[in-house]
Amino acid sequence: MAKILTVFYSLKGETIAPGMKIVNLEKGHTAVAAEFIQKAVGGDIFEIETVKTYMEDHMKMIYEAKEELEKGIYPELRNYPDIDEYDTIILGYPNWWNTIPTPVFNFLEHYDWSGKRIIPFVTSGGSGLGKSVDDIRKICVGAEILDGGAFLGHEVENSEQEISAWAKKCVQAQTNP
């Protein structure tokens, strides 16, 4: 049986809800989805955390993130898990400017992914995976990268059954090729 690590990057605080309404989240959408996934498939869970704190004002934060992406600035992370013992990494993140957030770029570039399976999932306002899976494939040479799953951020809290079923299907597909 494969050893699974669910890794996620998520922001809490201000975000945009449908209708361009600003809401304040105690826990980010991706964190909620990651917890559902870990509960459904087992294994361990790890949150990617940056040393710096992003701006609390959501609109300012998204432009800060865009500038990081355009300049290739990847914020320093608090720590990195030892992934050697894991066969499968379920990787969750919000869609930032049609790709993975810069902290996730940093995380991915830290490892040799040879022989690993990566199952990406994204939370977004409706833009889906964007080009994130292509970007993951470029970084994680030697890994098998599944196409991934996309979940609407504002619906995550009420989507445990859907998210869990998706995760179980992905993990089952790897154990029964």
Residue ranges and their predicted role:
Residues 23-24, 106-109, 136-138:
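Glycine-rich, phosphate-binding/catalytic loops in enzymes
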Residues 83-84, 109-115, 139-140:
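Short, conserved loop/helix-junction motifs that constitute active-site signature segments
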Residues 44-46, 143-151:
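Short beta-strand elements in bilobed, periplasmic/extracellular small-molecule ligand-binding domains
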Residues 1-88, 98-99, 105, 161-177:
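N-terminal beta1-alpha1-beta2 submodule of the flavodoxin-like/Rossmannoid cofactor-binding fold
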Residues 126-139:
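Glycine-rich, charge-decorated loop segments at or immediately adjacent to ligand/cofactor-binding or catalytic sites
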Residues 93-94:
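Glycine-rich, N-terminal phosphate-binding loop of Rossmann-like dinucleotide-binding domains
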Residues 148-161:
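Short, flexible active-site recognition loops that position polar ligands and cofactors
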